[in-house]
Each structure stands twice: as structure tokens, then as C-alpha cells.
């Protein structure tokens, strides 16, 4: 899957699929916003977009290259928002996600953390958006999961946030963990084209956390299960220990129980 959907200037200017490798060619010189899709698309989606001038109504396969965590400022203070970034980075560290697997950004108001899919190994499918949303919601408390919907997009780096007039810029982990919010804001007054990007890498560290169970649409109107355990945890308990994945399964169940207040 080699295509991403882009929107130039406004999230409303959608429906144009371009090669991911050529995304930089569409970066406006004046810093105007450029958005890209969360998901990757194949030739069938490209043909659909060409015919319909939109991806609305497309329910085929989607892939993903990076999983983005959106830490939005909302009505919070800049100090609190930066603290949330650092707490999330600490949580990733406890999950044994390596530094070389993530890239931090200041978005112009809040922060983005990009995790390479090499950490998860999500496979392309028509149910991928649901899998990503469920997986990330289970791993991270109070996460804004709306970005993982089928039509999710986000602004690319070196473009301006039109409300603050600050650029989305990449940050090193040292900067993210040690700089004040004011220092970060000062850096974001200009794009950061000179940033030394490195290719993100991973070794399936969080593959065992992926939620693969997708409820059928017709089941959504039915009465829910009497238990409040999420579907992927139900499946793990039902299947029991599986050779080669028992450690990851145990960690996932323990993490879920801890988040839901079950004492250790």
C-alpha cells in the first residue's frame, strides 16, 4: 500500500491520493497546512478516489505505517499538556518500546507521538481502523481515539497551526523530556527543516497487545455482554495460554485489570 490521502490548506480539501514517497512535494512553501491520512491505501482505493473524488464510502483494505498518539491541549495549560506528553513517553518506556521506535512533535498547540508500525505489526485489512482504535484505547488511558477512525487525518510537520501561528516541528526525546513549554514554543516560530530525522525501527514489541476481534455491525444493536471485559481480553481468557505467546497474553490481561481498578 503506497498511497496516502492528502488535504492541502484545509481538512475539507480531501479525496486526493498521492504516493507516500512523494508527500514532501506537496508541502506548501508558505507553511500552509498539509494533512495526510492516518492510513495507507492501495490501487483499488486510488481508483475509487479517482472515480468518486472522495474516499467516503470506501470500505476496502487499509494499511498503516505509523501510529500517532494525539495529545491535544484543549482547555488545559501548556504545562499540563507537556506533562501529559512526558507521562505518555514514560508509559511507552514501561511497555519496553525503544527510543528508536518513536518520534515526538510539537503540533502548534499540543503534541504528537509517532510510533512505527514495526512495533505493532498491524496487518492491512478492512477492519484495521477498529483494531487500531481498540488496541490504542486499551493501552493508553484517556487517549483521543477519534484520530483512528477510517477517515482520520493529521497535519504534517513544518506546517503552521493557523490558530497559534506556530509550526508543527519534530522534537528529540531530550528536548521533549527537558525543555520548558516556552522553549519549545520559541523553536516552533519557524519550521525545522534541518532536523536530523532517522528511520524508525521496531521489533514487534507490542504485537501481543493487538485487538483482532471485530464485532459485526448487526451485533452493535444487541444487548451487550453481561461482562464489561473488552472483546480482545475475552478472547484471550477463552482461548487460554497459547504456546509462544503466554508472556504477552499475561501482560495484556494484567494491564487491563490494573487499568480497571483490580488490585494486584
PLM features: residue spans?
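Modules that initiate DNA replication and primer synthesis
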Residues: 74-78, 86-89, 109-123, 158-162, ...
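DNA replication initiation on ssDNA origins
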Residues: 1-67, 71-85, 149-153, 158-199
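Short amphipathic beta-strand starts and helix->beta connectors
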Residues: 48-55, 96-100, 235-240
Amino acid at each position: 500500500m503506497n498511497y496516502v490521502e492528502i488535504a492541502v490548506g484545509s481538512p475539507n480539501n480531501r479525496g486526493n491520493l498521492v504516493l507516500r514517497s512523494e508527500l514532501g512535494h506537496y508541502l506548501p512553501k508558505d507553511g500552509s497546512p498539509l494533512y495526510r491520512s492516518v492510513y495507507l491505501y492501495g490501487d483499488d482505493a486510488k481508483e475509487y478516489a479517482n472515480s468518486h473524488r472522495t474516499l467516503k464510502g470506501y470500505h476496502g483494505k487499509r494499511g498503516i505505517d505509523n501510529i500517532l498518539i494525539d495529545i491535544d491541549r484543549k482547555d488545559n495549560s501548556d504545562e499540563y499538556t507537556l506533562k501529559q506528553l512526558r507521562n505518555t513517553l514514560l508509559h511507552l518506556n514501561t511497555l519496553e518500546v525503544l527510543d528508536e521506535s518513536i518520534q515526538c512533535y510539537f503540533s502548534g498547540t499540543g503534541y504528537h507521538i509517532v510510533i512505527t508500525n514495526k512495533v505493532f505489526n498491524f496487518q492491512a485489512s478492512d477492519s484495521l481502523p477498529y483494531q487500531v482504535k481498540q488496541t490504542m484505547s486499551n493501552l493508553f488511558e484517556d487517549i483521543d481515539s477519534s484520530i483512528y477512525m477510517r477517515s482520520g487525518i493529521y497535519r504534517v510537520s513544518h506546517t503552521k497551526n493557523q490558530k497559534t501561528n506556530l509550526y508543527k516541528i519534530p522534537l528529540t526525546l531530550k528536548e521533549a523530556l527537558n525543555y520548558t513549554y516556552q522553549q519549545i514554543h520559541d523553536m516552533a516560530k519557524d519550521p525545522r527543516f534541518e532536523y536530523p530525522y532517522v528511520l524508525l525501527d521496531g521489533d514487534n514489541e507490542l504485537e501481543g497487545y493487538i485487538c483482532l476481534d471485530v464485532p459485526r455491525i448487526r451485533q452493535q444493536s444487541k444487548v451487550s455482554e453481561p461482562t464489561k471485559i473488552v472483546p480482545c481480553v475475552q478472547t484471550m481468557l477463552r482461548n487460554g495460554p497459547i504456546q509462544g505467546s503466554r508472556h504477552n497474553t499475561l501482560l495484556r490481561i494484567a494491564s487491563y485489570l490494573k487499568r480497571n481498578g483490580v488490585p494486584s
